[in-house]
A protein has these predicted regions:
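Dynamic "connector" segments at or just before major functional cores
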Residues: 1-206, 212-228, 252
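An internal, acidic/charged active-site-proximal segment
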Residues: 201-280
Length: 280
């Protein structure tokens, strides 16, 4: 690619109108403003791990790829094809200060070329944004009972096809991807997509895709700085109730709630032996 594309700042005049006359681009401009206040565009430009180009004066700057993905996701998109469709929105490109947006093939190639180092750079930027936003938010709207709520969960995304990279037969017998996520307040501050067996420290059960909390300890360690200055409470489901996970949780949280609906057979047998007065 011989041409060079970047993102420029645009001077925008804000006008408040009734909802019957609101523009569809209003929310996108708000996203652009928040990203600018955080310093996202400068951060992306200064991150060498996000720029795999050999010739820096040619092609799309990394900030253009990030722009395409960010405004696709925040406009309801869920695929690289959706990001490509933004190229047809001339008014949006003008407002964002981009002359051209990459197609899905170019975005996919960029994601592959930045590799694990680039993914780590994006993760660091996301962590910093979450910390920045948490500290700017009104505490009354952010906290519940004076606590910042955290949530760890694994979502099983069922897939089908001859080959689906990263998928495995899960505990329910379905071919699925494991999407392990960690939330701090309203922000998803960390996530890993793929079979739990991908984790180098995963226990043996991960070989069968059954341990769906394998990434939790690493996520909690990476995101621990986000809880500074807050009283935090972590919620997790029964998949995180194994002893080594509880120890990890106790190290980072004074308050936590972990549901326990596995391996209850022995407990139910013991409970049945207790007299009725024990439950009154």
């Amino acid at each position: 690619m011989s041409r060079y594309y970047t993102k420029k700042d645009r001077r925008i005049n804000i006008e408040f109108r009734p909802s019957t006359k609101a523009t569809a681009h209003g929310g996108q401009m708000a996203i652009n403003a928040v990203a600018g206040e955080f310093g996202l565009w400068e951060r992306v430009r200064s991150e060498p791990r996000l720029d795999p180009r050999r010739h820096k004066g040619k092609g799309f700057e990394p900030v253009v790829y990030v722009t395409a993905l960010l405004f696709s996701f925040t406009s309801g998109g869920d695929s690289l094809a959706d990001a490509e469709r933004l190229e047809d929105d001339e008014s949006l490109k003008m407002l964002l200060g981009v002359k051209k947006l990459p197609d899905q093939s170019a975005i996919g190639e960029w994601l592959r070329n930045v590799g694990e180092e680039g993914a780590e750079a994006l993760r660091e930027i996301i962590h910093d944004f979450c910390g920045w936003a948490l500290n700017k938010a009104d505490r009354g709207r952010l906290l519940l009972g004076g606590e910042l709520e955290w949530f760890f969960d694994d979502t099983q995304i069922e897939v089908n096809g001859k080959k689906f990279e990263g998928s495995a037969i899960n505990y329910n017998g379905d071919l699925a991807l494991s999407w392990q996520t960690l939330w701090a307040g309203p922000f998803m501050c960390d996530a890993v997509l793929g079979t739990p067996a991908d984790h180098k420290f995963a226990p043996e059960s991960c070989a069968h895709g059954k341990d769906v909390s394998a990434w939790m300890p690493e996520m909690l360690e990476r995101c621990a700085p986000l809880g500074k200055g807050f009283t935090s409470h972590l919620y997790a489901d029964s998949a995180s109730s194994a002893g080594h996970y509880l120890e990890c949780i106790e190290e980072g949280f004074k308050h936590f709630t972990v549901s326990y609906n596995k391996w209850v057979g022995p407990l139910e047998t013991q409970a049945a032996e207790l007299p009725e007065m024990a439950w009154s």
